[in-house]
């Protein structure tokens, strides 16, 4: 394996191939304008936490539609956790407050 030639020994015919000098000149496009300053990021607004919408179980589509219709009409559909009772109580209280 041949030995490397040192950069000091560039007098030979292969001297220019051995040493690769870095260019000292920059392109006109890069040197013409400085790098633009980075704009500061705008502070994000922190909104109040919104309560998630009521979750509907993913069941049969027909049942889902029936439950929504029953809720819209105001019929007293039986509820597992008693939500309909509390909703009716709130409605009666709001009606009583309006009358006063």
UniProtKB/Swiss-Prot annotation:
Keywords: Chromatin regulator, DNA-binding, Nucleus, Phosphoprotein. Belongs to the HMGN family. GO terms for molecular function: chromatin binding; nucleosomal DNA binding. Residues 1-25, 39-53, 62-72, 82-91 have a biased composition (Basic and acidic residues). The keyword Translocase does not apply. GO terms for biological process: chromatin organization. It comes from the Eukaryota. The modification Phosphoserine is found at residues 6, 79, 94. The modification Phosphothreonine is found at residue 10. InterPro entries: HMGN_fam. Residues 1-100 are annotated as: Disordered. Interacts with the ligand binding domain of the thyroid receptor (TR) (in vitro). Requires the presence of thyroid hormone for its interaction. Interacts with transcriptional regulator SEHBP. Interacts with nucleosomes. This is High mobility group nucleosome-binding domain-containing protein 3. The gene is HMGN3. It comes from Bos taurus. Its main location: nucleus. GO terms for cellular component: chromatin; nucleus. Binds to nucleosomes, regulating chromatin structure and consequently, chromatin-dependent processes such as transcription, DNA replication and DNA repair. Affects both insulin and glucagon levels and modulates the expression of pancreatic genes involved in insulin secretion. Regulates the expression of the glucose transporter SLC2A2 by binding specifically to its promoter region and recruiting PDX1 and additional transcription factors. The keyword DNA-binding applies. Expressed at similar levels in mature oocytes and 2-4 cell embryos, but at higher levels in 8-16 cell embryos, morulae and blastocysts.
């Amino acid at each position: 394996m041949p030995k490397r030639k040192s950069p000091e020994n560039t007098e030979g015919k292969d001297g220019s191939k051995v040493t690769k000098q870095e260019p000292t000149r920059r392109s006109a496009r890069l040197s013409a304008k400085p790098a633009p300053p980075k704009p500061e990021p705008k502070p994000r607004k922190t909104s109040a936490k919104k309560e998630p919408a009521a979750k509907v179980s993913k069941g049969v589509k027909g049942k889902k539609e029936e439950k929504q219709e029953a809720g819209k009409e105001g019929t007293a559909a039986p509820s597992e956790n008693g939500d309909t009772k509390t909703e009716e109580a709130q409605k009666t209280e709001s009606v009583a407050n309006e009358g006063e």
